[in-house]
Structure formats: C-alpha cells, structure tokens
UniProtKB/Swiss-Prot annotation:
Residues 703-733 are annotated as: Disordered. Residues 714-733 have a biased composition (Basic and acidic residues). Its EC number is 2.7.4.1. One of its GO terms (molecular function) is polyphosphate kinase activity. It comes from the Bacteria. The active site is at H453. GO terms for biological process: polyphosphate biosynthetic process. The gene is ppk. This is Polyphosphate kinase. It comes from Nitrobacter winogradskyi (strain ATCC 25391 / DSM 10237 / CIP 104748 / NCIMB 11846 / Nb-255). Keywords: ATP-binding, Kinase, Magnesium, Metal-binding, Nucleotide-binding, Phosphoprotein, Transferase. ATP binds at N67, Y486, R582, H610. Mg(2+) binds at R393, R423. Pfam families: PP_kinase, PP_kinase_C, PP_kinase_C_1, PP_kinase_N. An intermediate of this reaction is the autophosphorylated ppk in which a phosphate is covalently linked to a histidine residue through a N-P bond.
Length: 733
C-alpha cells in the first residue's frame, strides 16, 4: 500500500447515524482530569500488589506521588487560571472549571489518604525485612551521637535559620520546597518568634545510620527528623514551642509570547518566571500547631481549598531514594536487554542490517544501544554526508548528542531540531542546543506555536554514485535511560519513499513549508488526524457492508472528541474495537446503544507502556497480513493532533508487520496479570484470566521470547512462541 487510497470500499448501505441526543450529550465523555486520577489510582494499586517485591512497591508509591505533583503543577494550575480569569466554558463532558476543581479535590483527598495508609503498611513491611525508618524519639544514645556528628559536618553548613519579623519577612519558597516552621520563645524573657528552616534540596532525604554489625537492620532517619534533634544549635537561646513541616507546589506552566526575536532568551526568562509561579497546593503536617499553620498559610496566600493536612510523610515522591539501598532481594530480578542478532549477523554494521530489510527494535527488551550505534556509525562513516535529527528529551551526558557533535566536527552536514518546549526539560534542551552549536551543528528550534514531538532521524549516505537514505522513527524519546524502563518501538528502514517523506517532514519544520506530497507517512497537524479518522470510517463501512471490521489501538491517552465519536459510530456499525490505553481515556466503553463493541484495557506493570500503535483490519479478520499497521509518536489527544508536529509511519515489511501486529499487539491484548479493564463510569477493575485460561504476563513474555524482525539468521533456529487470543479460537457468532 504505497498510499492511503482505498481505505474502504464505496458505501453500499444507508448511513447508520448515532441518535442525535446521544451524540450531543456531554455524558458520552469521561472527564479528562478524573480519568487521569483513575490512572494514577491504578499506579498506586501496584504498591499493594503482592506479586511485587517490597522496594518495587515503594517505587510505585513514589511514582504515584510524583505523578500527582506534576498533575497539580500543570493541570490543576491551568484550571485554576481559568477560574481566576472568569472562564466558564465547559469541558467536553459538560463541567465548568470550578466544577472540575471540586471533583478533583474530592478525588485527590481520597487518593492522598490512601497513599499515606499504604506507606504505613509498607513501612511496617520494610521493618520486617530489615529496613527500619525511625523518628527522633526512636534514636538510641549511640545513634544520636553519630547523627550529631554527621549533622554538624554535613547538614549544618547547608542550613540557613530564618527568623520571621518585620526586618526579616517571609522568604520565597520554591516549588516542591520542603521547610520546617517553628514557634520559638526566647529563653531570657519568653518573647515569641516564628522561624523557618529550609531543607536543602541537593542532599538525600534519608540518612543511613551505621549499624553495629552487618547483620543488623538498616536504620534510617529523614533529614528533617535529624534536623529537629538539633534545632537548639540553629537557634541558641530559644525554646521550641511548636513545629511542623510544610511543602508547596507552584504553577509550573510556561507562558510564551507569540512574538519573539530570540527564542532561547525568551525561554530562559520564562523559566525564571516559572520558579516564582503562584502556589497551587500547600501540604502541611497535620501535627503542626493550628496557630503556626495559619501563619504559614497566610504568608503563602494559600486558599483553604489549596491546603492539604498530611497525617504522615511529606514529599512522598522522595521515597524512591529507598530503592537505592543494596537489597536486590527486594527488587525485580535485573533484566539485560538483547541486542538484535541481525545487526550482529552483519558484523555490527547497522546500515547493512537495515539494507537487508526493515527492522523493528522493541525496547526495553532489545537494547537502545542499536539507536546510539546507528548515529555513531553515521558520525564516523566517511560515506555519510548528512544527518538530520529531532530531539525532544534525552539523557544527561547523552550519547546521541555526542554522536551528532562528532559528526559535525567530522565535516558532515548535521541538523538538530531541538524542542525547547519539552516540559521540565527546557533548561537541559537549551544546554544541549548550545553545546551542539559550538560543535558546528545547525540547530533549529521549530515552531513557536507547535511542539515538535516527532521522533525522527534521517541519515543520507553516498552509495554507488547516488544518495541513499536511512531512517529511524520511533514511539519514544532518544533517551537511553528511559529506554530501559519504557516500552517503545524503534523502526529502521532504507525504503526511499520513507526517506523522502522524512526529508519533507524536516523541511516542513525547518522551512515552514507545508509538504503537499508526502507519500506514506502522515504528519500532524496536517494529515495525521484525517488519516486515523479515514481508517476508522473505513472500518465502519466494511462493517456495514457485512465484512470483517476491526480497530486495534495502543496509546497513552485517548482524549480527542472527534476520534472518540468516530469510534462510537464504528461500534454502532458493528466494528470490533480493542483499545489499550495506559493513561487518560475519555471514551466510555461498553455502553449499550453507544459503545457496546468497544473494550478498553490499561496495562500497568514492571515497564511503562509508552508505544503508540494503530491497526485497522481493512476488511479482513484481525490480526491478518492485510491489516494497515502504523506506529507513531502521537497519542489521540487534541494537543498531539492539532498543536504538535507528530509522525505516523506505516509498517509494510511482512516480518515487521507480523511482529508488531501478531506479537506485540496480541500480547498486549492477551495480558491478564498486569491489565485493568476500563468500566463505563471511568473506573477500572483488575483483569483475571478467563476460566480455563493460563494467566499471561506480556512483560515476562517479551523478556523470554525474542522478536521476529531482529532475529536475523537465528530465526531459522528458533522463533518466539506464537500467541493466540481466546477470541481467535472461538467460532464467530
């Protein structure tokens, strides 16, 4: 299929429109913010999963807390801004910003309470396996002596005691800043004074106390707990009358002016403004005296509905530091990614492996090193004349950046499109941009009004008197660290048509010229939305004409109303719709008369499901060789379809097509051990294997079964276990 022509046959039956009242009702959508909170609930549930080792359960708890922090910094901050501006426009599900805030606060209150309850259970569990977290009152005499010495030499120099009075006003507290508030009385005359101690942000939260012997339990105390033992050293001559910790979250959205002469300088200024964003959430220890609590709230101008009293630990995201303890018995068994055998068959020559035929690399089961190797080989190959590369997020000391710099220093034409608007990575991306420019790379920042989220690399090589192109496109970032824990797909091809399409995408980004002649790829905000809609409508037509019709989609989020409505219409026509949505899903599945043919599941497990795959039956039974199969950087959200540059790439090589459709998608649909079924009300329930079925864990399957396209000669000796779904073995109704 060289183009997108003939997605569906001509309509032969009258259109079956959904009832107009149902189509117009906002109740057909689940609220985006509440759906996200349901997703974070699923993450939190992994912290009570008895199948996970203890420290992995702590990790899931910390992830759920970190997720919630970012939700407030971005989503809640945006809704609060709408309320301040008097905006009453309703969300697709019919709620005003104020109504959404009420529901968010109710849901978050329950979620935060459950996080603390789970932590209390996990803390007891850790104590049972030799990891004990102690409070100041639990410190022994010998431990206090060691803590005192450590405090004096390693913590005391970092602390600045701050008295609060007319000469010393309440200081600025940064977002996520952790602070101890104090009520003090001068020993000499009893004069009261309020004071603060800011906890330093560059040292570990948990202090490990040396054990008497290697067989003794590990005992840890928080840095604030250690500091509380020695407040008299910070405020000599004062007595502590009351104290408590607090933590704030600030608005972290960036406001960028549309007219800007220097984009980098503009972002640097905006980042400075972000650090001083308004307070969105104030977390206060419940044990803090009421008078001191009121003082802190008043000083930070926090409204009552922005204050959360915490009966437990603050900054729960920092519990992830506990996973650094050397206790492999309490963690997942380490997994070492495979390297594609086909690359080894060619002596490590990535270009030769790609020339043989297209290749899909499935991360993290297959190493991201092959992507790095692709660019390193391009940098050192004298026949490579040009490299074009997008960068949205990458790692510290990035080998991707080093390879691009090396190529430029070797005299090759290198263009790097760096997205400055990658949230929370803006400063790092500015740094990479300057480093690359110094190396001679042509750095481009793309569109001011659009984020460039596409994952695309184009290498141009001189071969036999002409130029050949090698393309990498994927579903995940060029980030070696996250590639070890995110499941993503890397697609390599030397197909000249894909090469031309990739070149046109780069020209669009660097030259602003809209491409009118892209042959196979689809690009947002230009054609990607319509390509997906055309396919869904095509399957709808197949169903109405009595042919097999199916839509399989895997993504991180499904929010776009037009896509959802098209899926509803497909369901009404009898299309079988299977959706794997890790996070937000605004579609209501299984509603009679609306979506009874739509099933939605979410996979939450050891690895973070991140790949986007879109499959359409094309009038044949799924999975089948004639299906249209795509991978993409885009989720089905308005921001991806309308406000970002994204790429949707078809997979046409038979082996690659089979691997993605019949191995990866089937495994995701088959999974029962890490899957949740989305219910019509937006909540979800854990899936279980059907009666007579063996439980199936897709992550375990891919850790123990090699891929198809990367096997090379080894495929003749052994191939991955073929997967079948229960529905495939049942006769059609």
């Amino acid at each position: 299929m060289d183009s997108i022509q003939a997605i569906a046959p001509e309509e032969k039956k009258p259109e079956l429109e959904l009832d107009s009242a149902i189509r117009a009702s906002p109740e057909r959508f689940i609220n985006r913010e509440l759906s996200w909170l349901h997703f974070n609930r699923r993450v939190l549930e992994e912290s009570v999963n008895p199948g996970h080792p203890a420290l992995e359960r702590v990790r899931f708890l910390s992830i759920s807390a970190n997720n919630l922090d970012e939700f407030f910094m971005v989503r809640v901050a945006g809704i609060k801004a709408q309320v301040r501006e008097g905006i009453t426009e309703r969300s697709p599900d019919g709620l005003t910003p104020s109504e959404q805030l009420v529901l968010i606060n109710e849901t978050v209150s329950d979620l935060a309470s459950d996080q603390q309850a789970i932590w209390r259970d996990l803390r007891n569990m850790l104590a049972g396996v030799g990891i004990v977290l102690i409070d100041g009152k639990d410190v022994t005499k010998a431990e206090r002596s060691w803590i005192a010495d450590h405090f004096l030499h390693n913590i005391f120099p970092l602390l600045t005691p701050l008295a609060i009075d007319p000469a010393h006003p309440f200081p600025f507290i940064p977002s996520l800043g952790f602070t101890i508030a104090l009520q003090l009385a001068r020993t000499s005359d009893g004069k009261p004074m309020n004071a603060l101690i800011r906890m330093p942000g560059k040292i570990d939260r948990f202090l490990r106390i040396p054990a008497a012997s290697k067989d003794d339990p590990v005992r840890l105390i928080t840095i604030e707990g250690a500091t509380s033992l020695f407040i008299n050293r910070l405020f000599p001559g004062y007595t502590v009358k009351g104290q408590g910790a607090f933590r704030i979250i600030r608005d972290s959205e960036l406001e960028i002016e549309e007219e800007a002469e220097d984009l980098v300088r503009l972002f640097e200024t905006a980042l400075k403004r972000r650090r001083r964003g308004s307070v969105i959430r104030l977390e206060i220890e419940a044990a803090m005296p009421a008078e001191l609590r009121a003082f802190v709230q008043r000083a930070l101008s926090a409204a009552d509905d922005e204050v959360l009293l915490v009966d437990g630990v603050l900054a729960m995201n920092e519990l992830s530091q506990l996973t650094r303890l050397d206790r492999p018995d309490l963690e997942f068994v380490p997994y070492v990614p495979r390297h594609p055998e086909r690359v080894r068959d060619h002596g490590g020559d990535v270009f030769a492996a790609i020339r043989q035929k297209d290749l899909i690399v499935h991360h993290p089961y297959e190493s991201f090193d092959v992507v790095v190797q692709f660019l390193q080989q391009a940098a050192r190959d004298p026949d490579v004349v040009a490299i074009k590369q997008t960068l949205y997020r990458t790692s510290n000391n990035s080998p991707i950046v080093r390879a691009l710099a090396e190529a430029a220093e070797a005299g090759k034409s290198v263009t790097a499109l760096i997205e400055l608007k990658a949230r929370f990575d803006e400063e790092a991306n500015i740094r990479w941009a300057r480093d690359l420019e110094r190396a001679g790379v042509q750095v481009v920042y793309g569109f001011l009004e659009l984020k460039t989220h596409a994952k695309l690399s184009l290498v141009v090589r001189r071969e036999g008197g002409s130029l050949a192109t090698y393309v990498h496109t994927g579903t995940g970032n060029y980030h070696p660290v996250t590639a070890r824990i995110y499941t993503d797909l890397s697609y390599f091809t030397s197909d000249p048509i894909i090469g031309r399409d990739a070149a046109r995408v780069f020209n669009y980004i660097t030259g602003y010229a809209e491409p009118s002649d892209i042959e196979r790829m689809a690009v947002s905000p230009l054609t990607l939305r319509n390509r997906i809609l055309d396919h869904i409508r095509g399957e709808t037509t197949f169903a109405r004409n009595g042919k097999p019709a199916a839509v399989w989609m895997k993504m991180n989020a499904l929010v776009d109303p037009d896509i959802i409505d098209a899926l509803y219409e497909a369901s009404q026509a009898g299309v079988s719709v299977e959706l794997i949505v890790r996070g937000i899903c605004c579609l209501r599945p299984g509603v009679p008369g609306l979506s009874e043919n739509i099933r939605v599941k979410s996979v939450i497990g050891r690895f973070l499901e991140h790949g986007r795959i879109y499959c359409f039956g094309m009038g044949q039974t799924m999975p089948g060789p004639k299906a249209a199969v795509y991978i993409s950087s885009a989720d089905m959200m308005p921001r991806n379809l309308d406000r970002r540059v994204e790429v949707l790439c078809p997979l046409q090589n038979a082996t690659v097509h089979q691997q993605v459709l019949e191995q990866i998608m089937v495994a995701n649909l088959k999974d029962t051990e890490q899957s949740w079924r989305l219910l019509p009300d937006g909540s979800s329930t854990r899936m279980k294997a059907a009666k007579g079925e063996e439980p199936f864990n897709l992550h375990n399957y891919f850790m123990t079964n090699p891929s198809l396209s990367g096997r090379g000669k080894s495929l003749k000796e052994s191939s991955p276990r073929r997967l079948t779904r229960r529905s495939e073995r049942q006769p059609p109704a």
